[in-house]
Amino acid sequence: MAEKNLPKDLTENRKEIDQIDRKLLNLIHERSKLVINAGKIKKKSGDKTFYRPDREASLIKTLQKKNKSSIPAENIKFIFKEIISACFTLEKKNKGLLSRS
């Protein structure tokens, strides 16, 4: 079905989804800037261990508990593990020399 032939309410719904996606992208960008800054702070303080699996697990568990959507907890875990992993890679790339332990 061509976009122009879609019912108006579906078109409006998709526009709202697109707006939310842009907001999510902006929030991920803001998160990535904070992660990079945290990495700089850690580097400056001499903290060479920047990956903390216990913090990641705690964060994900908290997010799963706060989840009020119909998205299953396992999917929430997957989504946030991906976001954390992408930010971890970015932090590692920007810091350059920290070890993962």
Segments and roles (model prediction):
Residues 1-101:
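Domain-level signature for soluble enzymes in the chorismate/prephenate branch of the shikimate pathway
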